[in-house]
Amino acid sequence: GLAACGVPVLHAIGLNDKIVPNAENSFPLINNYIKAGGMATVMPMTKGPQNLEGHHFPIERPSVIADFISSNAYPVKSILDPAQFHVARTRLTNSFIQFTKEKTGRVAFMGGSITENPGWRNKVTQYLQERFPETKFEFIDAGISSTGSTPGAFRLASEVLAKGKIDLFFEEAAVNDRTNGFNNQAQVRGMEGIVRHMRISNPLVDIVVMHCVDPEKIAEYTAGKIPNEIINHELVASHYNVNTVNWSKEVTARIAAAEFSWKEDFRDLHPSKFGQEVYARSLINYLSNAYGNISLEALPSSHVLPAPIDKFSYFEGNYVDVKNATILSKWSIDEKWVPKDGVGGRKQYMNRPALVAAEAGAEMELTFSGKAIGICIASGPDAGVIEYSIDGKPFKKKDLFTQWSRVIHLPWYIVLEEELKNKQHRIRIRMSADKNEKSKGNACRILYFLVNG
């Protein structure tokens, strides 16, 4: 809103106004504006006749108001058009028809903390409700902190598709795909997994992918380079004719044009209120253009589903319950796992069943069908090292400790093998006596098995 954008307010009031009482209107407005970070000044008008029960009064010292306008006005200059940072490969005709003719709409948002946290997402839902006032919407917030495209590909079925047919889908993963160290192949397989699975579930679904900004992306764009994760996500978007909104490039360009600064205004990859306004304004601009001039006589049309870019992409990704495992020794099911060491975790991954081991030699196995197998774990201060074998082949090792494990039981998605034959397999997992030098133990807490197939 205005406060987030730093717009100052000068409010002239009559102290005896009975038509619009200050206690019910002006005073709450000013207090809330200041709480929201805005600058507000009040000028009580006490001289001269107070007419219409104090609602009409003469303006005192108009020079003060003129000075306020002069000191806070910016020179008129053009700002960058958000549309130049949008790749509109297709219109959002199908969701438009659904919203206008069927009067119902299910809209899902998937991403990391930038999606989960309140801000741009709330403003976009408000825009859709105002744009289609007769439509009954269901909005799904499937944003979870620390998750990018690979987690998203395995989360999609249970956290989004299980809610019903999706009409409009928003996805962002560029920040976490970099932060969490997924390589180029994994970024393509993850994003294609999400987009293709979504289109298989509903060929009519309209999809928008957003590229969020971080300091590293600003540095690369400034140096004339395109960040790898954006290249990879655009590869998928282009292949599936999906629209994209490049917030990362847009913020970089606006900073270069001196519209605002990173340090004072946008502040962080988790945007300030001002930054949330930048994101919302851009995406709403895109939606306004995408929904413009669509005929009410238009008919829905299935999006073309091309051959996959990579046959091993995670478009059949899903969770498998940890209770499907066969315990051989020293593992157990904690029905409502929560951290017990005083270190926090993500709420979406607590108070649910976890397959837990805490000492070397613990062993279990799982039979599954598919092309890929992995685990979603809570990686905390005592995260250990696992050894795993598929179909009796030699054991491999995987360190479960992350750079964040000392301070949080982080939900961590690990794809152990991803180019298997699409048939039944058996994986055996055991705890190694080895551990990361920074870890306090030999623990593994599996929240879900990940299967692609």
Predicted segments — roles?
Residues 1-35:
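The feature captures the conserved acid-bearing segment of alpha/beta-hydrolase catalytic domains
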Residues 8, 104-107, 138, 372, ...:
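Residues that mark the start of a beta-strand
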Residues 12, 108-111, 210, 375-378, ...:
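Short hydrophobic segments within beta-strands
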Residues 24-30, 34-76:
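C-terminal catalytic histidine-bearing segment of alpha/beta-hydrolase fold enzymes
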Residues 77-109, 114, 128:
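Membrane/wall-proximal cationic-aromatic binding patches
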Residues 104-119, 144-148, 372, 381:
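Catalytic nucleophile-elbow at a beta strand-turn-alpha helix junction centered on a G-D-S/GDSL motif
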Residues 122-138, 142, 147, 151-300, ...:
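Alpha-helical cap/lid subdomain in secreted, periplasmic
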Residues 292-367, 376:
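Glycan-recognition and processing domains
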